[in-house]
């Protein structure tokens, strides 16, 4: 008898560094790339959070909202295509990873 894989429900976080007139198109491409990755994996995308070309402060605010959803067990984790686009530096990346792990979630980078 085959064992069923547990589905991990995640939010996809879309973030690109580009001129404002190209942001939506590039975020759509990033979403397609993430969906292609999770198609044959145990992850399921249950929500999407877009940066929309906002500043780093807005990214941090959105990140805290995602961490709160993980803490409340509404989702199991977050999927990002490129961690370097949502962080200022390496220390900020470690802090964001630690926040998600402390909340009991996972981060998947594609």
What residues fall within each predicted segment?
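Short, structured surface patches at the beginning of a domain
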Residues: 1-110
């Amino acid at each position: 008898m085959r064992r069923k894989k547990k589905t991990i429900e995640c939010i996809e976080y879309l973030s690109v560094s580009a001129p404002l007139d190209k942001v939506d198109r590039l975020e759509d491409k990033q979403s397609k790339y993430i969906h292609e990755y999770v198609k044959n994996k145990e992850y399921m995308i249950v929500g999407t959070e877009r940066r929309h070309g906002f500043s780093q402060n807005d990214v941090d605010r959105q990140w805290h909202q995602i961490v709160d959803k993980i803490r409340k067990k509404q989702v199991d984790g977050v999927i990002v295509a490129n961690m370097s686009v949502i962080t200022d530096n390496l220390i900020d990346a470690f802090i964001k990873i630690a926040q998600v792990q402390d909340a009991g979630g996972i981060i998947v980078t594609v």
